[in-house]
Amino acid sequence: MTEITIPDRVTSIGDSAFYSCTSLTEITIPDSVTNIEGFVFTDTPWLTAKQEENPLVILNGTLIDGTTCTGSVTIPDGVTSIAGGAFDSCTGLTAIAIPKSVTSIGDSAFYRCTSLTEITIPDSVTSMGDYVFDGCTGLTKITIPDSITSISDYAFRSCTGLTEVTIPDSVTSIGDYAFRDSTGLTKIVIPDSVTSIGDSAFDNCDNLIIYGHTGSFAETYAKEHGIQFAAYTCGDLDNSGKVDSTDIFYTMYYVANVAVGNPGGLTTEQIAAADVDGSGKVDSTDVFYMMYYVALHGVGKDVSWEEVLAK
């Protein structure tokens, strides 16, 4: 088979549909196709020709291949999905900018991109597939947006360069083997929203400390799996046993510094305590809630954080 025309009624092309069709040189895909899964054209002359034209191969809004990219890459605005395996074993990739038009990232999209050091996932992304960053040994920082509701199986397995991760409170589950063999991981902040964690999610993370609230699922999980747990108190950054103006100052200082690109000066546990609204980041909203909380307590109103956040 040297050429193929996809009929107009087709809306999706499945995983590995034309994998290793070694004679395929021409293909016509109609606009009706809105979903293209992983490895669809891998090992075809057609894909090789497209890679020579542009290392980012995009079809109908889906980035299907970037495996020949090197250095820092910017995905163009308008791309809505990154297909499974799009950057599979792309060892020359060092950085990538993902536009807010992207809503999904497929299985193994960045599998074994060993030179990738940092990635920020925009809050437009609502789903990430299994193995999405598996084997990214050079990855030292990952920002997970609060649009994500689950961390998939094997998502960050063998990311040995990761040391700290904060899970946003939009997430309800962490998949099996999600951080397995990420041997450098020492701190992970898990919010109360997480009620399911795979039994092997943190296998071989021998120096890991799970941070969370007392009585949370995270605490129960840590104890059942022999992982050290550290509780943090909402808003109490200096561990004084109360939330006061000192905690507000530390939070404002952090927000101001981060806004101009400087280090915030807070530890992982302090950041977790400062994130009073559980958004996964510390910002001016947290400062407002802390000031409101302190003001109410200052006039004798013994309100809880739940009551403050409900305002």
Please tell me what each predicted stretch does.
Residues 61, 133, 147, 156, ...:
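Gram-positive cell-envelope targeting signals
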Residues 44, 217-232, 303-311:
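A recurrent domain-boundary module in secreted/ectodomain proteins
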Residues 1-12, 21-35, 44-60, 67-81, ...:
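Structural signature of tandem-repeat unit edges
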Residues 232-311:
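Cellulosome-associated attachment modules in secreted, modular CAZymes
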Residues 197-199, 219-220, 299:
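Extracytoplasmic/secreted cell-surface and envelope-processing proteins
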Residues 16, 46, 50-69, 108, ...:
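Extracellular adhesion/carbohydrate-binding repeat motifs centered on closely spaced tryptophans
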Residues 35, 218-226, 279-284:
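Extracellular interaction modules
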Residues 14-19, 38-40, 84-88, 106-111, ...:
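Consensus positions within tandem repeat domains that build extended binding/scaffold surfaces
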